Amino acid sequence: MFNPLKLIPTGVSTKQDKTDLGFASAALRVPTGLFILNSGLGKFKADKQTAEFLQGMAASGMPFVKEMDAENFAKLLATAETGLGAALLLPFVPNRLVGLGLIGFSGGLLSMYFANDAMTESDGIRPSQDGTSLAKDSWLAGIGAALAALPKK
């Protein structure tokens, strides 16, 4: 009879196990880090109109953002995204730390998605045509959770 408990590691790890974890970590971190880093670097060039758009979108999920100056918000967002992207690409930053950072970042994106009725269908879950661009960011939460759950090296 199949026993799923036999699939759980017993704590003894081999060099191959550590290599596999390194590959899994890199496969999660590199494309995500490059994507977020590129997005953050692009926001440093945001003009006033773009900064106001970014602030308005963020304020739909996090109302306290309205109190900030739009251009300062855009710079803060650019810095945060660039920092998170860079941290994902630096192998000495622990998986758990970057995973938690990614979960927080994804939470901010998803708060905009769920707070804006135009982003979802009438059921409040499935994305509308307008909401697809934000709903797809749910994969960031999954990657963050996977990184946070990886065992220490």
Features from the language model and the residues they span:
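Membrane-interface extramembranous regions
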Residues: M1-G83, L90-K153
